[in-house]
């Protein structure tokens, strides 16, 4: 009977069978980006175009405290956003949940400008004196030659670049606006960045003192593929993140991993080696080449790949690969201790970890090899989208006007100071009277001046038209003056005005520098 049933099924499936055909073809199985599963989401195979959202910048935003309609408590409101509870805190400020007038939730990141200026000054004092590197940024006045990284313009340029250029699925884009709030002074105390809200928070909370529950193999692979695509895109833009860790990987409501926090990132010339001499980031995620004193220039790309490997280790095992409570012991373990995968039975994953966490940066796996590794692609059965498609959208450089807007906050103040400096400079020039110029001897000369005698009697005086009568005697008296002072008097220079002009010009130049740099 079983054979007869099988034969009937085969007969029904034959081309000549009289079975009724299906009126519509069956739909192909759909892939969803909401749940990591054995089948990778569509974003790993095809890049959906992301529309560029215009970023609104508001200077001197309106701030007020209002009574909540729910419980009567006071709410802090900035423009249309009501600031709610704090969800995180960093070195420059806190991150709060904000709700707009339509009930949409956003993440508002607060930046203390005082801390930004303090850090910019400290970086200026520690500025390296190594060989100069070409800079990708347009040259701006009041700044020293570039070294390929952000020096004096680090803080505001980094905020400016993030809010203008991060339009990518695995990199958190700026969602709404930039707000400056102060106390009515020209220089506000805080800046706020309104960004997309990743409601599921950080991918994992793991520290030297805290462990977490590890994720299964499929979730680790899915989110690590997101991380590969995001960091590959940043490297194509000439950006090295330098602080990749689980705390800086957020999960959206539809389970997309997004890279955040570019506070210590560096930007280089496109298609360069991206070598840096700075040490930045979390100690437990630093590569071995940065755990030594006077390490010199190291590859920023290789450092990011090491941090990606440590992040993957945390996701898979719920702990850090090197756990030491002393910084010196931690650095020694990172440099010398081999990586241990406790209880790992997957030899392919173990091979991946050994290649990512290679002590020698020259032998460490590179991004092109990493995206093709058998564990990442399931032995070639689930490849990532091509690199050319992932990095197709290279962002244009910001214009000088946009850079000035990001650095000076309001360039009108700089223009006003420059106009004032130009006016002070004009005061140094000789003041010509409307009537023919007379020498101190009383004779009229239209084309040249006459050198005064070496000595003159104090009683001698000449009446000349002057806009400042009370300065007349002092201006025209050449008695007991040095030779160059007598020349200035004859040519129309006022000694006190000359000195005052120099002082005012120097003060104006200092104000221009302070406004442009800090």
UniProtKB/Swiss-Prot annotation:
GO biological-process terms attached to the record: cell division; intracellular signal transduction
Superkingdom of this protein's organism: Eukaryota
UniProt EC number: 2.7.11.17
Binding site for ATP: 87-95, 109
InterPro entries, alphabetized: Kinase-like_dom_sf, Prot_kinase_dom, Protein_kinase_ATP_BS, Ser/Thr_kinase_AS
Annotated region described as Autoinhibitory domain, given as residue ranges: 404-409
Activity regulation as described: Activated by Ca(2+)/calmodulin. Binding of calmodulin may relieve intrasteric autoinhibition.
Organism of provenance: Emericella nidulans (Aspergillus nidulans)
Active site, renumbered: 243 (proton acceptor)
Primary role: Calcium/calmodulin-dependent protein kinase that operates in the calcium-triggered CaMKK-CaMK1 signaling cascade. Phosphorylates and activates cmkB in vitro. Required in G1-phase of the cell cycle for proper timing of the initial nuclear division after germination as well as for subsequent nuclear division cycles. Required for the normal temporal regulation of nimX activity.
Protein name (Swiss-Prot/TrEMBL): Calcium/calmodulin-dependent protein kinase kinase cmkC
Biased composition (Polar residues): 8-17, 60-71
Domain notes: The autoinhibitory domain overlaps with the calmodulin binding region and may be involved in intrasteric autoinhibition.
Cell division listed as a keyword: yes
């Amino acid at each position: 009977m079983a054979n007869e049933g099988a034969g009937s099924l085969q007969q029904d499936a034959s081309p000549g069978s009289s079975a009724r055909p299906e009126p519509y073809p069956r739909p192909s199985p759909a892939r969803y980006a909401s749940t990591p599963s054995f089948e990778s989401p569509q974003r790993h195979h095809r890049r959906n175009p992301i529309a560029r959202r215009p970023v609104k910048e508001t200077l001197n935003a309106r701030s007020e405290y209002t009574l909540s309609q729910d419980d009567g408590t006071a709410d802090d409101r900035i423009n249309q956003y009501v600031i709610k509870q704090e969800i995180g805190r960093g070195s420059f400020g806190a991150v709060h949940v904000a709700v707009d007038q339509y009930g949409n939730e956003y993440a508002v990141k607060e930046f203390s400008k005082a801390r930004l200026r303090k850090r910019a000054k400290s970086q200026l004092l520690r500025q390296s004196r190594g060989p100069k590197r070409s800079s990708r940024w347009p040259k701006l006045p009041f700044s020293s030659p570039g070294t390929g990284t952000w020096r004096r313009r680090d803080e505001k340029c980094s905020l400016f670049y993030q809010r203008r250029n991060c339009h990518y699925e695995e990199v958190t884009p700026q969602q709404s606006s930039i707000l400056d709030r102060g106390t009515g002074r020209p220089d506000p105390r805080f800046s706020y960045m309104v960004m997309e809200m990743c409601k599921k928070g950080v991918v994992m909370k793991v520290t030297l003192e805290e462990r977490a529950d590890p994720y299964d193999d499929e979730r680790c692979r899915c989110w690590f593929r997101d991380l590969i695509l995001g960091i590959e895109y940043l490297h194509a833009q000439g950006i090295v993140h330098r602080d990749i860790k689980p705390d800086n990987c957020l999960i959206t409501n539809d389970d997309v991993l997004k890279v955040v926090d570019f506070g210590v990132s560096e930007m280089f010339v496109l298609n360069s080696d991206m070598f840096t001499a700075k040490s930045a980031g979390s100690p437990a995620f630093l590569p071995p080449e940065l755990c030594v004193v006077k390490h010199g220039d190291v590859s920023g790309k290789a450092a990011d790949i090491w941090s990606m490997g440590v992040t993957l280790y945390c996701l898979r095992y719920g702990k850090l690969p090197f756990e030491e409570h002393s910084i010196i012991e931690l650095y020694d373990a990172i440099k010398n201790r081999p990586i241990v995968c406790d209880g790992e039975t997957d030899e392919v994953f173990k091979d991946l970890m050994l290649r990512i966490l290679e002590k020698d940066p020259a032998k460490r796996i590179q991004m092109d090899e990493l995206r093709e590794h058998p564990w990442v692609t399931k032995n070639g059965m689930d490849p990532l989208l091509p690199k050319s498609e992932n990095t197709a959208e290279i962002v244009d450089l910001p214009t000088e006007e946009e850079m000035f807007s990001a650095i000076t906050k309001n360039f009108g103040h700089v223009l006003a100071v420059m106009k004032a400096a130009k006016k002070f400079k004009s005061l140094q020039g000789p003041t010509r009277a409307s009537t023919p110029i007379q020498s101190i001897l009383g004779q009229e000369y239209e084309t040249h001046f006459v050198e005064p005698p070496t000595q003159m009697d104090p009683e001698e005086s000449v009446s000349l038209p002057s806009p400042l009568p009370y300065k007349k005697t002092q201006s025209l008296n050449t008695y007991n003056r040095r030779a160059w002072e007598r020349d200035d008097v004859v040519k129309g220079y006022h000694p006190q005005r000359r000195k005052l002009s120099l002082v005012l010009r120097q003060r104006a130049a200092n104000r221009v520098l302070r406004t442009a740099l800090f």
